From Swiss-Prot:
<dbReference type="InterPro" id="IPR019845">
    <property type="entry name" value="Squalene/phytoene_synthase_CS"/>
</dbReference>
<keyword id="KW-0414">Isoprene biosynthesis</keyword>
<keyword id="KW-0472">Membrane</keyword>
<dbReference type="GO" id="GO:0051996">
    <property type="term" value="F:squalene synthase [NAD(P)H] activity"/>
</dbReference>
<keyword id="KW-0521">NADP</keyword>
<dbReference type="InterPro" id="IPR044844">
    <property type="entry name" value="Trans_IPPS_euk-type"/>
</dbReference>
<dbReference type="GO" id="GO:0006696">
    <property type="term" value="P:ergosterol biosynthetic process"/>
</dbReference>
<comment type="similarity">
    <text>Belongs to the phytoene/squalene synthase family.</text>
</comment>
<keyword id="KW-0753">Steroid metabolism</keyword>
<keyword id="KW-0325">Glycoprotein</keyword>
<comment type="function">
    <text>Squalene synthase; part of the gene cluster that mediates the biosynthesis of squalestatin S1 (SQS1, also known as zaragozic acid A), a heavily oxidized fungal polyketide that offers potent cholesterol lowering activity by targeting squalene synthase (SS). Catalyzes the condensation of 2 two farnesyl pyrophosphate moieties to form squalene. The presence of a gene encoding a squalene synthase supports the identification of the cluster as being responsible for SQS1 production and suggests a likely mechanism for self-resistance.</text>
</comment>
<dbReference type="GO" id="GO:0005789">
    <property type="term" value="C:endoplasmic reticulum membrane"/>
</dbReference>
<keyword id="KW-0443">Lipid metabolism</keyword>
<keyword id="KW-1207">Sterol metabolism</keyword>
<dbReference type="GO" id="GO:0045338">
    <property type="term" value="P:farnesyl diphosphate metabolic process"/>
</dbReference>
<feature type="glycosylation site" description="N-linked (GlcNAc...) asparagine">
    <location>
        <position position="114"/>
    </location>
</feature>
<dbReference type="InterPro" id="IPR008949">
    <property type="entry name" value="Isoprenoid_synthase_dom_sf"/>
</dbReference>
Length: 415
């Protein structure tokens, strides 16, 4: 039930309320579960999917039946890996073999793990992992091969970082991108192989690994930028020292509330945003190769959320104080845009790229590079949709006209 405060918030922000109502009316277009005929293991998998990530669970519901359960299982397996890697109560000696052998563990339909820290968010997933393994056993062999390969790559990559101790402080940009590759880039590779195997994406995508890599890097780098305060509080620093050491002697200075430190911190965050933003046009190019609507929805929603989150983080000192997120209204609007077509997604990317340009200022050492990255997004969209700006201008004019008429109508009714 919505609180009185919530009602007042949306009454004062009608632009926020409209997409929420629209999405609530439309979201039933996704896959509808037949819960009466689901096995206990399937129900458990959906339950843990929702517990680990409500947003990903919602995105998953966009998928067709052919890929719904394989990708659900794929996500839960990788989330299991991530839970082991994240658990600060487990020693390196315990973590390393668990991570490296996880690709074989998923074939054991009785395996469970009860030694996660009591405060670990996704502890229950590992406690009841046998239900995931049993459902993994049922999917097509072609999908199993892909999921096994990606699990092996990710597990070994995570183990390498655990053994080296780099999770408490990544040193070089190349190490930062390598970490993002292992936790997100390989996921993009696995998903693309699943899409091509299911004949819902252009096979030529597999010949362009840069586009696949950018999809994962864009999401992961954005998450790392957004989560900087939360990770710092857990003594985990993913921002590479090669970047932050230009702006501070110690990472503590980046999260300091002192004005002299905060200015440098924002310049540091600009460089982090720039690295992610340079991947954005590749993401649009990748999405152009997705042929089936439900799969397009699945890949487009997270990417649109990422560009919006990147804009929210840019030049925003709040990221050093707390975890921030885009509003519910903005989220619903992005989901509406992302479940239509590439043109609507391009409009969303352009909208947020221009907001980034508007917030950019000449005093920032990355001013010109950030403008260039935003212009690169514009060029991709202009090349693909040369008349899009005219169409957007007409739509904006129509919206303003309706808004003005509505205001006059309300005033007339009051008088």
């Amino acid at each position: 039930m919505v609180s009185t405060r919530g009602v007042l918030y949306y009454l004062l922000r009608p632009k926020e309320l409209r997409p929420i109502l629209q999405w609530k009316a439309l979201h039933g277009l996704g896959h509808q579960r037949d819960e009466k005929n689901e096995s206990p293991d399937v129900k458990a998998c959906y339950q843990y999917l929702a517990l680990t990530s409500r947003s990903f669970a919602a995105v998953c519901q966009q998928l067709d039946r052919e890929l719904l359960m394989p990708i659900c299982i794929f996500y839960l397996i990788l989330r299991g890996l991530d839970t082991i890697e994240d658990d600060m109560t487990l020693s390196k000696e315990v973590k390393e073999p668990l991570l490296r052998n996880f690709y074989t563990t998923i074939y054991d339909q009785t395996w469970t793990f009860n030694d996660s820290g009591t405060d670990e968010k996704d502890r229950e997933l590992l406690v009841h992992f046998d239900c995931v393994a049993r459902e993994f056993h049922k999917i097509k062999d072609e999908y199993k091969i892909i999921i096994t390969d990606i699990t092996k790559q990710m597990g070994n990559g995570m183990a390498d970082f655990v053994v080296s101790g780099d999770l408490t402080g990544i040193q070089k940009i190349k190490d930062y991108e390598l970490y993002c590759h292992y936790v997100a880039g390989v996921v993009g590779d696995g998903l693309t192989r699943l899409f091509v195997e299911a004949n819902v994406a252009d096979p030529s995508l597999l010949k362009n690994p840069r586009l696949i890599e950018s999809m994962g890097q864009f999401l992961q780098q954005t998450n790392i930028i957004r989560d900087v305060r939360e990770d710092h509080d857990e003594v985990r620093h993913f921002w590479p020292k090669e970047v932050w050491s230009k702006y501070a002697q110690d990472f503590d200075h980046l999260v300091s509330p002192k004005p002299q430190d905060r200015k440098k911190a924002l310049q540091c965050s600009s460089e982090m945003v720039l690295m992610a933003l340079n991947r954005a046009d590749d993401c649009l190019n990748y999405m152009a190769g997705v042929r089936e609507q439900t799969v397009f929805n699945f890949v487009a929603i997270p990417q649109s959320m990422a560009i919006a989150t990147l804009e929210l983080c840019f030049q925003n000192p709040a990221i050093f104080d707390k975890n921030i997120k885009i509003t519910k209204g903005a989220t619903c609007q992005l989901m509406i845009d992302s479940t239509q077509d590439l043109q609507h997604v391009c409009q969303a990317f352009r909208r947020y790229a221009r907001r980034i340009k508007k917030k950019n200022h000449p005093e920032d050492p990355h001013f010109h590079d950030i403008n260039a990255a935003c212009n690169k997004i514009d060029r991709f969209i202009d090349d693909r949709y040369p008349n899009l700006q005219d169409e957007q201008a007409k739509a904006d004019t129509m919206y303003l006209a309706v808004l003005v008429l509505g205001v006059f109508g309300v005033v007339a009714a009051i008088l």
